[in-house]
Amino acid sequence: MKKVLIITHTRDNECIEIVSENLRKLDARVIRFNVDLYPLEYSLSTCYQDGQWQIFLDHKGTRETLHDVAAVWYRRSHNLADGLNKVLEPEYLSSAHGEIRQTLFGMLEGLHCFQIGRFSQYRRLDSKEEQMKIASGLGLKVPDTCITNSPEEARRFVQAHPAGAIAKMQSSFAIYREGVEHVVFTNVITEDNLDTIETLQYCPMQFQEKIEKARELRITIVGDAVYCFAVDSQRIENAKVDWRREGLELLEQWDPYELPEEIKEKLLRLMDVYQINYGAIDIIVNPEGEYYFLEINSAGEYFWLDRLIQGQISEQIAKVLLGEAPRRFQPITLGEPTFSM
């Protein structure tokens, strides 16, 4: 029986259990590693002795061997080492967190089995700048862009785009003020905003030309399978710039969309460049029918779209993990280490 390791956390959504159930139907054994409980409730050990490598995951009296897993799905590592601040003195926290990350991600990098996407490849995707350079190199349209912490450069960019510009962060995060979460969304920026832009010096932002939208696309790629959905975000005023502001309102408004073959092939080549088998891609279709690539997210959400097609995406993830469906990229490893079975 093949074993599949899923890296996630206790507050992840329903997709984990749906994929796990699909894996079990294919006669696989699922090991779920909730990394928010590591290291307080989990122990992770990698040992080399007598010419053999062994990896053990211990949790509540149960020991799992990881050196013999057939595949890994690195879903997310949110809240890694949650609660550590309650048991360690503040002066040790930074060092401990560093060692925890090194141990977990070092173990994952050293697992010579199929992985839908390696952590190192996903970290490469953190560079929105490289994403756009690669996408444009593949022939995809990308918006005019300026990534800067220079207020003067930002002013020049906005003034050069009188039809409109937007400002957004390169990473997803929220600001907590008086215990309330404030998600940072994409916003329109005009010359009127430029008088208050001096604080940009302390935190870079990404500025782009404002693309008029006929449709917004979310494309989920798993192996060779491409699932494309479209939404008319312009029907709701508060969703026109960033549809996530009205994500719940638009939840049932997404429809399957036939992506042009030329665009599909370029997106698959993008996956090959990054050597990954999962990606969630955002694209704008303008009124002239032109496709503008915005970004690819290595762990982009898909569950609300999965519901619209009776769980086909989750089923495909399970099949790709087990080699029951075509894999877009399979690693070639030289000098395989010897693992104890």
What do these predicted regions represent?
Residues 282:
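Nucleotide-cofactor and metal-assisted catalytic machinery
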Residues 10-25, 31-141:
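Conserved N-proximal alpha/beta basic substrate-recognition cap immediately N-terminal to
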Residues 6-7, 222:
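Short hydrophobic segments within beta-strands
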Residues 1-5:
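Extreme N-terminal starter segment of soluble prokaryotic enzymes
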Residues 23, 160-256:
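Phosphate-binding site of ATP-dependent enzymes
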Residues 255-265, 269-276, 285-341:
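C-terminal active-site "lid" helix and adjoining low-complexity regulatory extension at the edge
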Residues 49-51, 59-60, 221-225, 233, ...:
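Short acidic-glycine loop/turn motifs at beta-strand connectors
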Residues 130-184:
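Loop-centered beta-sheet repeat module
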